[in-house]
Amino acid sequence: MATRIRTPSPEDFPARADLVVIGGGVVGAATAFYASRAGLDVLVLERRSALATLTTTRSLEAFRAQFEDATDIGMMRESIETFERFGEIVGLPGYDLSLHQPGYLFVTREPDGGAKVAARVAAQRAAGLHDVEHWTGHEARRRFPWLSPDVSAAAFRQRDGWLASHELTYGFARASGMLFFVETEATGFATAKGRLEGVVTSRGDVRAPRAVVAAGPYAGKVAALAGVSLPISPVRRHRAGIKAHELIPRDAPMTVSLETGAHFRPEGPGAWFGWSNAFEEPPREPTDDVPANPLFPALALDAVSQFAPFWGDVAQTLKSSNVTVEAGLYDLTPDARPIIGASGTVEGLFVNSGYSGHGVMGSAAGARRLADLIVGREREDTNPFRLARFDDPRAAAARKRPL
């Protein structure tokens, strides 16, 4: 069945669905796909005029399995394996995600960084990530001569990389065969005796025994309509772009400083930059139009030039017309892991949000897990991403997921 993405008219608004997904970004579209594969009739609601037009398009569109925790590694490996065989897995032979796998390179400039990277890689290999490599600074510069002379060690995995998030979103949507309503906002929930009975929208009501909040930085506000409190904080994050420059190595991997978190990757003849620590960013109310700080490109360029000095040369010859800067919102949780599973307050209401900047890379595995939870193929009490984990006092003190 062909996917139908449209603004609904009163006469074609469905009376009921097995599942309503609130949010038409990459996570919502992936949720629709896996739920449809589980046999559910799905309706997706997106209040904006098109899918994937908010946080999905403000990302660096990257993916990696190089985390430190086995749970995170397993999740991202599953997503990456899906991306690598996307057309085959979702039933769209030849579908192009613009998949690039030049790798992810984590570097350290600390004198004792070699031991820290070795421990990091050992933990990753113990978690099943056997193809991550540990390099000395010399080995890293032999592979990538543009690295700083004081880079003391590095970790590299070739199968990490990036893709086109717009194509990923629409691929999931198309493969789902489900109905997607744009310009349609969820404004409330119908419940009775603690159970979900339907979703109230700006264009009509739909009866449904199940719904998923996949609304990114708006997830907290949407869940609150049902009396559910989510520990999700919208926090501003920037990305800067350079349209083109002859000094940018086009074969560079995504390169990340283990000390600062500053990172860059090539994009055609140009590049993208990110750096979560450029500014102190308090939580804010979710909004579609997030103002960018014009100082970010200069700060990010300086940060990446510390481990890749050619960026200093780029900065010397760069024209302002060749630089872009945008801002969006991360949906941060206390432990920087997503909330995937039952709401715990309203039976039939589920959450797939809080990816904390990793929504593109985690979308496939997270949505697959949620679909399995909804239909009973997985148990909520053994789900590591369940909302109830924050009821444990130890969770409040847990440090955020490392790079």
Give the residues covered by each predicted segment.
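Glycine-rich FAD pyrophosphate-binding loop
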Residues: S36-T56
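Extreme N-terminal leader/targeting segments of oxidoreductases
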Residues: M1-L19, R37-A38, K400
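Central helical "cap/lid" subdomain
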Residues: A52, D205-P253
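N-terminal Rossmann-like FAD-binding beta1-loop-alpha1 element of flavoenzymes
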Residues: A17-L43
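C-terminal catalytic lobe of FAD-dependent flavoproteins
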Residues: S305-L403
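Active-site lid/adjacent beta-loop-alpha segment flanking the redox-cofactor pocket in flavoenzymes
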Residues: A244-G348
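Dinucleotide-binding Rossmann-like beta1-alpha1 core, especially the glycine-rich loop
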Residues: L60-R143, G261-H263
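Helical element adjacent to the flavin cofactor pocket in flavoenzyme catalytic cores
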Residues: A155-P209
